[in-house]
């Protein structure tokens, strides 16, 4: 595909020798209004070079470049040179690339097979898989898809919270109040009841906390009874989690959680000792990070048990040895920023240069309309309940609007779950938000169902046409303003994917395909597609095909399926 910006940089650099290509590229802007052109060059910086007023320089540059085949019009407006793309060449370039690449339009082999680890979701064993987990789960899954699409080998790791003092608490609760048959039929809610009961009883009887610590130490020492109970709790939980992952269409390359790294702790602590990083503090081992404006990081408690941070360090070292990663990405809430800052710095101080390749991708907090979620108090919204409610609500809408639709159950699942994922990926990941049933399940505005419906509309037109796509004889039929706006958004899709990968921000893609859906629906409203004139019909169908391709790819990258009918 012709890169019009690159062509523009070449043209400008022929006229201005004092700046290099990169400097010129950084100067080029996109005008705020379409009527001002497709690109703009501000000439303020050239005043010192040419010893002339910027508006005179702009006028001279415009007169020299005018008449180029790639740009139909070049004009100066005050100190700016505005460039208007040749719409016919532009349409031909973009649409023929779509024809050539199909569903791989936008894919590039930037990664050349390099390994990128994306750690995401990572729920705690025996605790609810709640609405708060949706963000890490869908952001991580989208990033994995994006990196694979760009030629990396993305490895999805679910770093399960399957280790720690909470297992001591749960084992105590299980032994005192648990009913294994009840747990088997409904694991997570039953584990939650036990967890809540433990905390309620421990407030009255502090000895329970001591018993919990004792059980966790037995677990760390590989005591057979403790290990058997732990494995049973883990397996029951994982079975539940996988059911939700299946609903979301997500799988993982590894479920290696915290426990996987427990045997590696002594070597990690020994390496820190050898590097002179550890200090004693009240019987515990810490790394002093005051020099880096951070509080000390505790590596080992006074009773000899390890912490989350120790296991994260061990996991990173293991991953580097095993996968030789290019990037090691952690999709974890923004409240964990200090934790990651600390252990990234410790890895660096241990002499591992690859510490800079470990990246924390933070996201904002989710809270309920009446306050923050708390597992200890049992105030949670289960993610599975949210997904099922979304499916049910979608089914009601289908029954109301299209009762004769085939495969209603399947369509309701695709659209309902897609609505939840789309909602999570529409706004910038760093923003906190309050979870609202009404907003999440709304089927109006900038939503997943709107984009999915636009895709179905394009699919329906294409099915009716039976048209076999080939190069057009006349691309001037797609140079009107509405068609040009659609084609421009299609042309920006490949760079949108790259931008999303560089910023670890799937919402860039979500918003882009929403804008494409809007632009296409305006075009569709004003232009009949299946007209009698064969050439016009073929041109418009080609545009429909291009939109169909990009919407399907965009939704797929976000982890959202596309129904064939709605």
From Swiss-Prot:
<protein>
    <recommendedName>
        <fullName>Arginine--tRNA ligase</fullName>
        <ecNumber>6.1.1.19</ecNumber>
    </recommendedName>
</protein>
<dbReference type="InterPro" id="IPR014729">
    <property type="entry name" value="Rossmann-like_a/b/a_fold"/>
</dbReference>
<dbReference type="InterPro" id="IPR008909">
    <property type="entry name" value="DALR_anticod-bd"/>
</dbReference>
<dbReference type="InterPro" id="IPR035684">
    <property type="entry name" value="ArgRS_core"/>
</dbReference>
<dbReference type="Pfam" id="PF05746">
    <property type="entry name" value="DALR_1"/>
</dbReference>
<keyword id="KW-0547">Nucleotide-binding</keyword>
<dbReference type="GO" id="GO:0006420">
    <property type="term" value="P:arginyl-tRNA aminoacylation"/>
</dbReference>
<dbReference type="InterPro" id="IPR001412">
    <property type="entry name" value="aa-tRNA-synth_I_CS"/>
</dbReference>
<dbReference type="Pfam" id="PF00750">
    <property type="entry name" value="tRNA-synt_1d"/>
</dbReference>
<dbReference type="InterPro" id="IPR009080">
    <property type="entry name" value="tRNAsynth_Ia_anticodon-bd"/>
</dbReference>
<feature type="short sequence motif" description="'HIGH' region">
    <location>
        <begin position="123"/>
        <end position="133"/>
    </location>
</feature>
<keyword id="KW-0067">ATP-binding</keyword>
<dbReference type="GO" id="GO:0005737">
    <property type="term" value="C:cytoplasm"/>
</dbReference>
<dbReference type="InterPro" id="IPR001278">
    <property type="entry name" value="Arg-tRNA-ligase"/>
</dbReference>
<comment type="similarity">
    <text>Belongs to the class-I aminoacyl-tRNA synthetase family.</text>
</comment>
<keyword id="KW-0648">Protein biosynthesis</keyword>
<keyword id="KW-0030">Aminoacyl-tRNA synthetase</keyword>
<keyword id="KW-0436">Ligase</keyword>
<dbReference type="InterPro" id="IPR036695">
    <property type="entry name" value="Arg-tRNA-synth_N_sf"/>
</dbReference>
<keyword id="KW-0963">Cytoplasm</keyword>
<dbReference type="InterPro" id="IPR005148">
    <property type="entry name" value="Arg-tRNA-synth_N"/>
</dbReference>
<dbReference type="GO" id="GO:0004814">
    <property type="term" value="F:arginine-tRNA ligase activity"/>
</dbReference>
<dbReference type="GO" id="GO:0005524">
    <property type="term" value="F:ATP binding"/>
</dbReference>
<comment type="subunit">
    <text>Monomer.</text>
</comment>
<dbReference type="Pfam" id="PF03485">
    <property type="entry name" value="Arg_tRNA_synt_N"/>
</dbReference>
């Amino acid at each position: 595909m012709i890169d019009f910006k690159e062509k523009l940089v070449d043209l400008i650099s022929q006229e201005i020798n004092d700046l290099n290509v990169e400097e010129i590229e950084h100067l080029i802007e996109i005008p705020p209004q379409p009527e001002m052109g497709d690109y703009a060059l501000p000439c303020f910086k050239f005043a010192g070079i040419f010893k002339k007023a910027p508006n005179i320089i702009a006028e001279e540059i415009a007169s020299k470049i005018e008449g180029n085949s790639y740009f139909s019009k070049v004009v100066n407006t005050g100190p700016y040179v505005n460039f208007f793309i040749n719409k016919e060449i532009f349409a031909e370039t973009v649409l023929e690339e779509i024809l050539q690449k199909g569903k791989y339009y936008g894919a590039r082999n930037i990664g050349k097979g390099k390994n990128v680890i994306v750690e995401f979701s990572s729920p705690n064993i025996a605790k609810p898989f709640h609405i708060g987990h949706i963000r890490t789960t869908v952001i991580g899954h989208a990033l994995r898809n994006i990196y694979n699409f760009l030629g990396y080998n993305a490895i999805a790791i679910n770093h399960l919270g399957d280790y720690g003092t909470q297992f001591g608490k749960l084992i105590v609760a299980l032994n005192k109040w648990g009913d294994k048959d009840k747990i088997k039929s409904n694991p997570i809610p039953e584990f939650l009841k036990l967890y809540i009961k433990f905390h309620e009883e421990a407030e009255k009887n502090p000895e329970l906390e001591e018993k919990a610590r004792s059980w966790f130490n037995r677990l760390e020492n590989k005591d057979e009874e403790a290990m058997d109970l732990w494995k049973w709790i883990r397996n029951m939980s994982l079975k539940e989690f996988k059911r939700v992952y299946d609903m979301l269409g997500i799988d993982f390359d590894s479920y290696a959680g915290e426990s996987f790294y427990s045997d590696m702790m002594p070597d990690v602590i020994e390496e820190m000792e050898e590097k002179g990083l550890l200090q004693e503090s009240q019987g515990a081992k810490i790394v002093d990070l005051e020099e880096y404006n951070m509080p000390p990081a505790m590596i080992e408690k006074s009773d000899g048990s390890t912490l989350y941070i120790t296991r994260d360090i061990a996991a990173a070292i293991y991953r580097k040895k095993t996968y030789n990663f290019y990037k090691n990405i952690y999709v974890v809430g923004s409240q964990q920023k200090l934790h990651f800052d600390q252990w990234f710095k410790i890895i660096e101080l241990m002499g591992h240069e690859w510490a800079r390749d470990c990246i924390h991708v933070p996201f904002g907090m989710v809270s309920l309309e009446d306050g923050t979620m708390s597992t200890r108090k049992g105030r949670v919204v289960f993610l599975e309940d949210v997904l099922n409610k979304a499916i049910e609500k979608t089914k009601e809408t289908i029954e109301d609007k299209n009762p004769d639709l085939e495969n209603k159950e399947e369509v309701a699942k695709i659209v309902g779950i897609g609505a939840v994922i789309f909602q999570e990926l529409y706004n910038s990941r760093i923003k906190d938000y309050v979870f609202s049933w009404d907003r999440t399940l709304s089927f109006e505005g900038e939503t997943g169902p709107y984009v999915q419906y636009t895709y179905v509309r394009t699919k329906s037109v294409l099915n009716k046409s039976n048209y076999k796509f080939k190069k057009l004889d006349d691309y001037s039929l797609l140079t009107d303003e509405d068609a040009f706006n659609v084609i421009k958004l299609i042309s920006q899709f490949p760079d949108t994917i790259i931008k999303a990968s560089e910023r670890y921000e799937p919402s860039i893609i979500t918003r882009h395909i929403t804008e494409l859906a809007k632009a296409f629906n305006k075009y569709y409203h004003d232009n009949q597609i299946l007209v009698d004139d064969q050439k016009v019909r073929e041109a418009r169908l080609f545009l429909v095909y291009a939109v169909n391709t990009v919407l399907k790819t965009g939704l797929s990258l976000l982890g959202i399926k596309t129904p064939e009918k709605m």
